[in-house]
Amino acid sequence: LFERVTYVGFAVPGIVLALALVYFGSGYLPWIYQTLPLLVFAYVVRFLPQAVGSSRTSILQVDPRLVEAGRTLGESSLGTFKRVTLPLTRSGIVAGAALVFLTTMKELPVTLILRPSGFETIVTQIWRAQESALYQYAVVPTLILLLISGLSMVVLLAQEGGQEGL
């Protein structure tokens, strides 16, 4: 049920989510409006399904007999999770984190609407330069974004390659 609820944030367009949080934040919680915590909350709502889906897939691949074996050998639930489940699901969790990082880096509507005054990201720098037709100022941030995106893809593909052997 929790997993399905998280998909709502992914289905809603970013601009709709951002405007809803502007309405809620400015009307009911003015002290949180245009703060970093509100922006982070919007990112969590927007991109949590990617992390949950990736992690869920990894967890479903864990053989329950391995977890049972850890428990019968005297490990606590937490110990079994740390020593058995977590190592087996680590690649899926890392892939989910890389995917969320990659999509968060490219998110524009939520960032433009909810960012605190004076808070700049790579995407907002590119947007501002493009909006002013100062394309020469967009080159360096664009190249940085491409480099970060490329490295994130390398991490994702490396994780995928590591899962092929399972």
Regions found by a protein language model. Name each.
Residues 18-29, 42, 54-56, 97-104, ...:
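A structural signal for multi-pass alpha-helical bundles of membrane permease subunits
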